[in-house]
Amino acid sequence: METIYLLAKLPEAYQIFDPLVDVLPVIPLFFLALAFVWQAAVGFK
């Protein structure tokens, strides 16, 4: 269990990017939502 935690934790040098890494997995969902809104705007052609 401790090994998994060590692999999941960013190295010390990259700690400043920790909040960014927490947000990155959500970005594809925004693209999915954008595609839906775009298709709704053009009438689902």
Curated annotation (Swiss-Prot):
It comes from the Bacteria. Residues 1-8 form a propeptide. It holds the Pfam family PsbK. Disruption phenotype: Grows more slowly than wild-type both heteroautotrophically and photoautotrophically, approximately wild-type amounts of PSII assemble. Its main location: membrane. PSII is composed of 1 copy each of membrane proteins PsbA, PsbB, PsbC, PsbD, PsbE, PsbF, PsbH, PsbI, PsbJ, PsbK, PsbL, PsbM, PsbT, PsbX, PsbY, PsbZ, Psb30/Ycf12, peripheral proteins PsbO, CyanoQ (PsbQ), PsbU, PsbV and a large number of cofactors. It forms dimeric complexes. One of the components of the core complex of photosystem II (PSII). PSII is a light-driven water:plastoquinone oxidoreductase that uses light energy to abstract electrons from H(2)O, generating O(2) and a proton gradient subsequently used for ATP formation. It consists of a core antenna complex that captures photons, and an electron transfer chain that converts photonic excitation into a charge separation. Belongs to the PsbK family. This is Photosystem II reaction center protein K. It comes from Synechocystis sp. (strain ATCC 27184 / PCC 6803 / Kazusa).
